[in-house]
Amino acid sequence: MLSTVFRRTMATGRHFIAVCQMTSDNDLEKNFQAAKNMIERAGEKKCEMVFLPECFDFIGLNKNEQIDLAMATDCEYMEKYRELARKHNIWLSLGGLHHKDPSDAAHPWNTHLIIDSDGVTRAEYNKLHLFDLEIPGKVRLMESEFSKAGTEMIPPVDTPIGRLGLSICYDVRFPELSLWNRKRGAQLLSFPSAFTLNTGLAHWETLLRARAIENQCYVVAAAQTGAHNPKRQSYGHSMVVDPWGAVVAQCSERVDMCFAEIDLSYVDTLREMQPVFSHRRSDLYTLHINEKSSETGGLKFARFNIPADHIFYSTPHSFVFVNLKPVTDGHVLVSPKRVVPRLTDLTDAETADLFIVAKKVQAMLEKHHNVTSTTICVQDGKDAGQTVPHVHIHILPRRAGDFGDNEIYQKLASHDKEPERKPRSNEQMAEEAVVYRNLM
């Protein structure tokens, strides 16, 4: 309901935000007090959302301290931020928490949290791109030694100020992530950061303005500034860029705040004036994202309904489900969500996704069933043996000598018609799907 209300009011809405610039160090309480003062000031100014930079919690003296001070998202320290959100009726973008992974404490995630005015987490994004640089005798900065890369894309989140795409710092150099967020409906892009002094001087504003212009989005970039310890210094210059590429708010190089008005009707106007996304040549190039779907309901397979508990993996374009009458142990089907009979009916994006998903499922099945061979087959049309007029890929793990002189194709063409091959029960199929779902 909340998301629906936002979408109805965002189109012409104007919203006031605060962007915070900090100099975090290894004193967590001092960092919190600095953030608290800024959040309180934003509350007094009736801001709807406050943006804090990457490493708002702390910046350690060394790799070991970065690891040792990491915390859970529901710890006592984070509860203080949730209480501030509730107290001031304000949303928080907490740009980069050192988020401890219980299964791998030596490599925390760098997590961007969105907390609503009730203190509830609305989104968690783990930084995808880690900055690793080693030039012998000159510089060594290996983020992967004390942090772990995220493994999934997080769709833009509905907030009171608009639909917000989440990124962190180094992610700004990878335009595909911003493009994906824009295509998923983002009106704003956020880049909480701790840019180094040299790269900040050269690229900070240029990168932020580029992401704003090419995606026709507001860009909000809260930043660290100044000397955190004798070994580390950040550039500062937190800023807000409008979708035309104009810097509409900016801090200098000290601990400070800047404020900006987000006018979502301006986003709509610019996109109407320059409809660049409708001019993209998707017939020549495309952006494929390996994205899992959060959809949990059943789906159509031609005229048949596939129950949700028989589906073990899905993306925005494809889904994978267990077989009613498997030819081999582990025989599953991959199908596009859109009901079309022929492979040639699929878009390029659907085709790419279908076969990428098939490859992932094949790898999982081979490992689980301890086999090294797989038959992957599309029966494209009635004369090719297709009995259900909906494109689907058969994935069949193979064992040595299982079908004599490789008679698998004859078996596939007739297995639905064999009276001795009894359909499995819903319970059997659901149990198998649970196993595969966990493995995927």
Swiss-Prot record:
Domain CN hydrolase as annotated: residue spans: 14-264
Any Pfam family the entry gives: HIT
CDD domains: FHIT (cd01275), nit (cd07572)
Subunit and interaction comment: Homotetramer.
UniProt record similarity statement: In the N-terminal section; belongs to the UPF0012 family.
A molecular function GO annotation: nucleotide binding
InterPro entries assigned: C-N_Hydrolase, C-N_Hydrolase_sf, FHIT, Histidine_triad_CS, HIT-like, HIT-like_sf, Nit1/2_C-N_Hydrolase, UPF0012_CS
Biological process (GO), any one: amide catabolic process
Reactions the enzyme catalyzes: P(1),P(3)-bis(5'-adenosyl) triphosphate + H2O = AMP + ADP + 2 H(+)
Active site residues of this protein: E54, K127, C169, H392 (tele-amp-histidine intermediate)
EC code: 3.6.1.29, 3.5.-.-
The protein's required cofactors: Mn(2+)
Residue ranges annotated as motif Histidine triad motif: 390-394
SUPFAM superfamilies xref list: Carbon-nitrogen hydrolase, HIT-like
UniProt-recorded name of the protein: Nitrilase and fragile histidine triad fusion protein NitFhit
